[in-house]
Amino acid sequence: MELTDIHCHILPGVDDGADTMEEARKILRLEYRDGVRTIIATPHYREGMFEPAMKQVVKVYIQVREMAREMGMHLYLGCEYHTNSRMVKDLRRRRRPSMVGSSYVLTEFSGAHNYEKIRNQVYDLLTEGYQPILAHIERYPCLREDIQKVRELVDLGAYIQMNAGAILGESGSPIRKFGRQVMEEDLLHFIASDAHGVKYRRPNLGACAKYVSKKMGHSYAEKIFCENPDHILKEARRQANLRARKRNKAKEQTT
């Protein structure tokens, strides 16, 4: 089973993830050893904390993408966007990338955000044609303490991501039990490493995939680690084709 990691802070020097190109290379090696063949790099964007210039992000991404290619891996560019009032406008104007240029958006909240705040942001994104993936929901008490709220967000149209460490129990037994409940109630769409380096929050998708396969079955693990991530890439290709057709049509109208 070839895994896809949709949430990884592998680009050095743009957030609190990898520090150097050498550390990025080590992350790639660990991911490859775990069975990961596709990674979506998701540097943070958080107002007042992580605001890397897009030119720098793209420059570093191209370098790491080449390292990945040499290892037989695919690397794509996304973003972990910490929600703010300008989020939809920034996405529309392409100031920050969605997930691989698709309509999927990896959306982060603060632990202090209440359910109403999360629901309103999900609704706003959906209304504008985006498909929000809620990053590491195990960190949000308002969802962790009431799984019905998770179900309501999924019914609204949101997608749910949890970190591999949380599923494996690295964040404590209560969070591991929450993860098991989310899986058993079929509310989980993605599990990702959220790796930040080789010492702190190392890649661990391989161990998690084995655990999920044992607890939930191989077909369930394939859906979470392979099939659902592939939907992002397919949607990205669809969006790219739409943009290309629009550009061609605009050229035809000016000639």
Stretches found by the model and what they are:
Residues E51-Q161, Q239-T255:
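Extended substrate/RNA-proximal surfaces in nucleic-acid metabolism proteins
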Residues L205, K210-T255:
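Mid-to-C-terminal alpha-helical segments outside catalytic/metal-binding sites
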